[in-house]
A protein has these predicted regions:
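Fungal secretory targeting signals
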Residues: 1-20
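N-terminal intrinsically disordered, low-complexity, charged/polar
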Residues: 85-87
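Hydrophobic transmembrane signal anchors and adjacent membrane-proximal interface regions, especially
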Residues: 4-9, 66-68, 256
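Acidic-aromatic substrate-binding/catalytic surfaces of carbohydrate-active enzymes
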Residues: 21-83, 93
Length: 574
């Protein structure tokens, strides 16, 4: 009888809220609430948001719904209370800010009257050291059969093709045709390049629009899952990886109390991508959002400067990253405790980063290829301050380049595998397997695309080059090996004219070792352009080189399927 009364009460509440004319929060009882407006409504339980009604259709159905979690599915946040913390108007449109409280922090839904969706943001109070942190929707798979990111658009593989006997590794299956593969990692995309992403069908679309990405961890090369098919249930997954780890060596961030992720817009429509694109442009033009009542969020300044190489060239199109104060034990990709900003310099080397939160930052700059493709050094400014309402102009910045003479370079120095065969191709599982066991690259004859993006098989990859001068004993040659990524289970020795000058081996130590070569999952998780960038220098005696024909060989001595080395650039200089 009690259950019947509760169901009847809940049904009557749903009927009542369906007739609501503005944004609302209604408590149902037993840690259950209904939120929404005159366009949509959702029933929020202790952990999961279900019964998402939009245009009189339940968009969740039998799927899991909306939730917030960290460290994968291990920890789904439990909501202990809900309340409206602000009720106001903006541009004469009423809105409410609904706060759901968990032990780890506060999840906010900002709902405007007539809005198709809601703004969301999360404020940390007690998240542990992380790791992965995300918000997401798991939606009805018949309503949302397709996925879209800035780099991929199409039908999500049907659950019927995920055959248990065909599973070969982490969330990866051999397709029923026995030739191709099915994996959620093929739906990866660049985090900071997204305009909008989500899942859609012919009548409904659910999208995330993140115009301000300063709360993301990592730099330009940050890539993450966006959408996919849940392999256990078939749910259509719309994944908001606000602190992702899927392609990194490590991620261990301590978040300050008050760290805010968002706001971003969760947007509902009829499945139209052109409409979502138009909404995305509106949101990007509106950021930072003026309606948000948070002093720290609005305390911002700007950073600008002009980068000039020490040889006089402008640092054209250089990648500029504003991150943690230097020195730091973390790589630029691994930084993620606070707020981070990325941009590119223009042709003259000038750059401006607007709307930077006030605080102290470290500046790092590196080549993004193009006219400075040969620059293998990194410019760093250990600390700079950003003050509210002020422009921090760094003036002219001199970036020291290597004074040595270059004997050869294979590939642009840009932290990516762009230019090589399959380098930067759409995310695709096992594409590295198309690279050969043995390869010979002839400097001056071969093209960049003759080198392949990754080395995964046992064999020799050799660079042959001509040296027109007698070796000078006073000049020590330096071999620079820049890796766009590395997945463990592969070892390589490096030879110059038959003499070992180094190695690329996980965990090795010693004079010729790449100490600390840790693994990232890039190559075996469909990445083709980058994982985590690594840089190594191997110095050796000038007597190893000779006047005339020379060669450098990377000999793969140990391999694991789809693991190995993803190349950025190889440079020999003296």
């Amino acid at each position: 009888m009690t259950k019947r009364i509760f169901v009847t009460l809940a049904a009557s509440l749903v009927t009542a809220v369906a007739a609501a004319t503005g944004p609302f929060l209604t408590a149902v009882g037993n840690q259950t609430w209904i939120i929404g407006n005159d366009v949509w409504n959702m029933t929020q339980g202790p952990k999961y948001g279900v019964k998402l009604y939009y245009k009189e259709h339940d968009c969740v159905g039998d799927a899991v719904g909306h939730y917030v979690s960290y460290n994968g599915a291990a920890n789904d946040l439990a909501w202990t209370s809900a309340k409206i913390v602000k009720e106001d108007t903006y541009n004469n449109v009423p809105y409410i800010d609904v706060l759901f409280t968990a032990a780890e922090g506060d999840m906010h839904w900002v709902i405007f009257a007539g809005q198709h969706g809601a703004y969301q943001y999360f404020v940390n109070h007690a998240l542990p050291t992380l790791g992965e942190f995300r918000t997401l929707w798991r939606l009805d798979n018949t309503t949302f059969p397709n996925g879209r990111t800035v780099t991929k658009d199409g039908v999500l593989p049907p659950l019927s093709e995920y055959l248990p006997q065909n599973k070969i590794q982490d969330e990866t299956w051999l397709a029923p045709d026995g030739k191709s593969y099915i994996t959620k990692y093929d739906w990866t995309s660049w985090s900071r390049a997204q305009d909008f992403f989500g899942v859609y069908g012919d009548k409904f679309g659910s999208w995330y629009i993140n115009p301000g990405k300063d709360y993301y961890n990592g730099n330009h090369a940050k890539q993450e899952l966006m959408v996919h098919r849940e392999s256990a249930s078939g749910d259509a997954v719309q994944l908001n990886m606000i602190h992702g780890t899927h392609f990194m060596v490590s991620s261990s961030d301590v978040f300050p109390d008050g760290k805010m992720w968002g706001p971003w817009l969760w947007y509902l429509n009829d499945g139209s991508k052109s409409d979502a694109a138009a909404q995305s442009k509106t949101e990007f033009a509106s950021w930072p959002y003026p309606w948000l009542d948070d002093e720290a969020y609005h305390s911002r300044g700007s950073v600008s400067g002009k980068l000039v190489l020490s040889d006089g060239r402008p640092a054209s199109n250089a990648a500029v990253f504003l991150g943690d104060v230097l020195p730091s034990p973390k790589t630029a990709l691994d930084m993620g405790s606070t707020y981070y900003y990325t941009t590119y310099a223009d042709a003259s080397g000038s750059f401006t980063i607007p709307d930077v939160r006030t605080g102290s930052y470290g500046l790092q700059v590196w080549s993004n290829g193009s006219s400075i493709r040969d620059v293998r050094t990194t410019f760093a400014l250990d600390s700079l301050a950003v003050e509210k309402g002020k422009a921090t102009n760094l003036g002219s910045l001199t970036w020291a380049v290597s004074p040595k003479r270059k004997l050869f370079q294979v590939g642009d120095f840009d932290h990516y595998s762009y230019g090589f065969k399959n380098g930067g191709a759409p995310w695709q599982h096992a594409l590295v397997a198309e690279c050969p066991e043995n390869l010979v690259y002839k400097v001056g004859c071969s093209k960049t695309e003759d080198w392949c993006m990754g080395q995964t098989y046992k064999g020799n990859w050799t660079i042959r080059f001509w040296n027109g001068q007698e070796p000078d004993a006073d000049k020590k040659p330096t071999l620079i090996v820049s890796l766009a990524g590395y997945s463990s289970g592969a070892s390589s020795t490096i030879w110059a004219n038959g003499i070992q000058v180094g190695n690329l081996t996980s965990g090795a130590t010693g004079r010729t070792a790449t100490d600390g070569l840790a693994s990232d999952p890039s190559l075996y998780r469909s990445a083709t352009a980058a994982g985590e960038w690594r840089y190594f220098q191997f110095d050796f005696a000038a007597s190893v080189l000779k006047k005339g024909a020379n060669e450098v060989t990377f000999q793969m001595t140990r391999n694991t399927t789809w693991h190995g080395f993803m190349w950025d650039s190889i440079i020999l200089e003296w």
